[in-house]
Amino acid sequence: MNGMNDLSLDRIVEILAAKGREGEYWDYKQEWHENMADLLKDIICFANTPHDANCYLLFGIDDDGHIVGMQKSRRKQADILEAMDNLWFIGDVKPEISVETVVINETEVDVLTVYDTQKTPIYLKRNYGEMLAGCIYMRNGDKNTPNRGMASIDDVEKLWKKRFGLLQTPLEYIVGRLQYQTEWKQQDHTYYNMYR
């Protein structure tokens, strides 16, 4: 999956659909979730991954990777963002998402991108739907943590290591910090970057 973030969205959909199976970075959904709580749980699980790549919920693709389109009503990005704004996240850190529609072989596929973040783990202060406050839900392989469960201690440790840059080599960490110029502050004739 390395380098996938640099491809066009329609090319990403074609590649992931051709795999014919779900994975750590993507999930097929023939239709949008009827229950917003289930959709938000999927988003939180995809935000909590130890890798450094964006994740994708692909709507209009069946479980075997066939592009079939959608028959039922679709969700709007604004509605999803509003629902996330109503959740109570620890540290007020929310997943960043976007929703776009691509056309593959004359069939529309909605793509919900969950952008990679170093600010893991992301979890709730209060119960929501079947999700429990303080529980860390994540994507592991092609499965999400169960509603009433919690990620394993080893997986939670990886998420904290990701937050503190401990899963990268020192060079990767430094290059990563240099890329985010908006986080650099000027003081007199020098610049500094404080970890957030």
Set out the residue ranges of the language-model regions.
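Conserved N-terminal catalytic/coupling substructures associated with nucleotide/phosphate chemistry
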Residues: 1-196
